[in-house]
Amino acid sequence: MKKILRIMLISICTIITVMVVFLAAVYFVNLISNEREKGKIESYGQKVLVDGKQMNVLIQGDGKETIVLLPGYGTASPVLDFKPLVNELSPYYRVVVIEPFGYGLSDDTDKVRTSQNIVDEIHECLQKLNINKYTLMGHSISGIYGLEYVNQYENEIKAFVGIDSSVPKQEDSDELPVSSLQLLHQSGFYRLIVKMNPDQLVMPKVDEQTKDQIKMLTFRNFLDESQASEAENFINNFKNAQRLHFPKNLPVVFYLADQTEEETPSWKPMHEELLKNVDHGKVVTYKGGHYLHHTKSKEIAADFREFLSNNESHR
């Protein structure tokens, strides 16, 4: 009997030791990888001083009209994520990609991520760049911030474009389990999961070097202080947006993904509801997933050019 208990005790101790060694290995591999990757992340764009911190911005193209691109939640590198769309738009427009605090190469911030604070920072950035007239084009959560933005700076906005953009009354605006996800990241298990299943990182159609940069920025920025605060403020930001509507004279176009419409039957009707009092608005559905700017950049750019041209001729 004592021999059996001794064997069981040794087995339990062995299992615990193996688990501790495994956890420690995952943690330290992540720690070392993070340090190594700091020197491998390549700079792009330019820095703008906003609210005492550095906000990263890319400007591409020399067109007379300006388009400002705003990312979806948690985008590791908005500049690299929007690359296919920027390449389609920049021959005709000046394209400005904003990397909000906590995204891409921008600084992190401890300022609460309310829609108002995010809008204020984006506007300050554009003012510093002397950009005073532009089309706002936003993906996903930027539909909420964009709605706040156009109501505050209507005189500066020529049009609003939503790429499968969020709407105030959508049903999945719940808070994320921030603490659990941060623990997953800090422990190194997020890196391990990505290593085992790299396809879970949604990537645009870019070269391998760019994909590597996106991957490194994903590990660097994942649920940093800004993104954690943003997630914790989802419910309030969506709720506050329910008081808003698009200005009557503002041209608005929504590019929606048919996969999102299938998953959420109310998706298209909710966007159409936002356009009911808009003089020049439309909804276009493309086949594809939530990241339409990865797969339908050419179609979006062509349709937007026609949409903007038609609205210019009606003025």
Identify the function of each model-found stretch.
Residues 2-67, 91-93, 132, 309-315:
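Alpha/beta-hydrolase fold catalytic core
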Residues 53-105:
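Conserved HGGG/HGGXW glycine-rich cap/lid loop of the alpha/beta-hydrolase fold
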Residues 74, 100-104, 145, 167, ...:
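Alpha/beta-hydrolase active-site loop signature
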Residues 97-135:
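Active-site loop/oxyanion-hole signature of alpha/beta-hydrolase fold enzymes
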Residues 131-174:
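Conserved hydrolase catalytic core segment
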Residues 163-195:
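A catalytic-pocket lid/entrance helix-loop region that shapes and gates access to the active site
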Residues 206-279, 286:
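Conserved serine/cysteine hydrolase catalytic core
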Residues 288-298:
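Catalytic histidine-centered segment of alpha/beta-hydrolase-like enzymes
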